[in-house]
Amino acid sequence: MSISSCSAQDGCASTAMTRTAMRQNKFATSAPASVPRLTGTEPQLGSMQGAQELLEQLKASFTSSHLIQAIGLSGRQLPLLTKDQEILPYLFNAAGVRYVQPHPNGDASQRILLLNVPASSPTPDVVLSAILKHRLELIHEFELSLGYEHLSSDQILEALLPTSIVDTDGVPTGFTIVGHIAHLNLLSVYKPFRFLVGHIILSKHIGTLRTVVNKLDSIDTQFRFFEMELLAGEADFVAQVSESDCSFQFDFRSVYWNSRLHAEHMRLIKKCRPNQVLADVMAGVGPFAVPAAKRGTWVLANDLNPSSYESLTKNAEINKVLLREGEAKPDKDGGLVATCMDGREFVRWSMLEVWKRGFAGRPMGFDGEQFDVQDDKLRQSARKMRKEQAKKNRALYAVRQAENTLEGAAESLANLSVDEPDVAATMGQVERHPERKLVDHFVMNLPAIALEFLDAFRGAYTHLATIVGKQRLLCQLELHKLDASIHRLPMIHVHCFSKDPFTPALDILTRANEALNIPRDAPYRLMAKPILPPAQTFAGLRKLCDASQSASYLSSHPNYSKYKHLESQHDFMQYVHQEWLERDAAQHTPNLSIHYVRDVAPNKQMYCLSFQCPSQVLWANTSTSQHT
């Protein structure tokens, strides 16, 4: 293992260096050149236990000794140097090594300060001056032993893997953390070393990780979760995760969870206002549904996967938002009803279920134009009401506990009645807007197929009207005039993928209109101004002259010849805006947005299409609809 050091002659010292700068200026350590490289054919690599034993054998080869200079001093004298801005740059600064060490003479009152100066180098003048000034001891040679524990996962793998792999593909240390589980997605080139990689990662995150898994290529075709292989640690796949002020628990083997979508979850959660109704068609374990319910939204959440449904129900219960069938009306706003059925069936079912339940309407007095401000005030008011109600309940409980003695009961009743604060009105006494009988938001978060499920909305109100009565439904639709938080038409938020590198918005809207069975020339079709294509599109267009592989998917696109000459972002957007003008007369459907979520692959992006479902779709004649 080598240590790169600096001295005053190197110009590394800075009289103004702070502790923060010192921490950021860690000195690089590397594995000794003597560490044996693996070939991938070692028998121990074929099993989890074998890889663990091999790693234990290899750890000793990472050990190396270094002779550096140090300063001997008493414990009381430490602040004289550790707070000296001129000395700080010369203190030894490497990961996992304290620059304050016990003195080798064994005196418990003595310490040494390790210096970032090799024994063979001259002692910096500023250090010598400090030693003379404070009458300290200069130790010309101190042997420092560094090893496996002082290196990162990257450095260890760089030393162990074949140079042909390291130079071409780097090292596989990137992973996602889900609770106590590290989730890797290893390339095939690392397959012979997968168990070793798992044990190295586990050894570097002791106390945080207990399980390391690798995602396999196979995917469950019905429920869309990946098979995985245990690489290291415990076979414990039940993860506990905190997100959006909620706690989640689930078996990672049988459900889908992506911690990288946290920001997207919160973005949509914030679109749901208190007392609105949200129907989550593909809810999974509840990353949208549970936090939304906790923030005061009425939620109906569904997932076809029985394991997801089980976790969804449990997570709603853990976070105290579960509404069970047959239970009394909740004593607070917001709650979650969980179901397990097909997504298309759920769309129709949820509309009827909301109508039957008639969720509590929004309390009056929070109807200002600044929705965010009013919603925050409403949530604060609800929290205050719950706290005061809880205080009253505790006082009443104390009375009941004291009923064993007349004297104790009388005293408790007296304490309860004297200077008792006014208790907020109960749920039934709060003046409210009418009951919520319609869904305000639908969320469909299964990007591989969610767009296909939009056909479930065709004729949905026509179907509902045959059950509840058309006139009653029409009257309910007019309530938005009294309560601005009511959507006259439901907002649909559908996640999807697009592989169109040039016009992703047009690609998404074309598929959405087809699923909704909206004719291409219909005035109510979904339309939107073009959005910026992925950044790699422009980079690829510039590289195409070299026939680079990164741009091959561009040149194979059917519209490549139309856009290949547009290398700059400005020229490209001008061109597609002109196409939009000719195609849609530059019309953009009101309340429609297409939000970029993340890159899934160089030629595959995830988006969220949000739009208000056209009334022509909801009231379509189902007898002539393509919906099945």
From Swiss-Prot:
Species source reads Mycosarcoma maydis (Corn smut fungus)
State the protein's name. Answer: tRNA (guanine(37)-N(1))-methyltransferase
Which BP terms from GO are recorded? mitochondrial tRNA methylation; tRNA N1-guanine methylation
Indicate the principal place this protein occupies in or around the cell: mitochondrion
The record's listing under Pfam families reads: TRM5-TYW2_MTfase (PF02475), TYW2_N_2 (PF25133)
Q: Under the cellular component aspect of Gene Ontology, which terms does the record hold? A: cytoplasm; mitochondrial matrix; nucleus
Binding residues annotated for S-adenosyl-L-methionine, in chain numbering: H265, D303, L304, D342, G343, N445
Q: Which GO terms describe its molecular function?
A: tRNA (guanine(37)-N1)-methyltransferase activity; tRNA methyltransferase activity
Under catalytic activity, the entry for this protein gives: guanosine(37) in tRNA + S-adenosyl-L-methionine = N(1)-methylguanosine(37) in tRNA + S-adenosyl-L-homocysteine + H(+)
The EC number on file is: 2.1.1.228
- EC primary class: transferase
Q: Quote the subcellular location field of this record.
A: Mitochondrion matrix; Nucleus; Cytoplasm
Q: Which family does it belong to?
A: Belongs to the class I-like SAM-binding methyltransferase superfamily. TRM5/TYW2 family.
Instruction: Alphabetically list the UniProt keywords.
Output: Cytoplasm, Methyltransferase, Mitochondrion, Nucleus, S-adenosyl-L-methionine, Transferase, tRNA processing
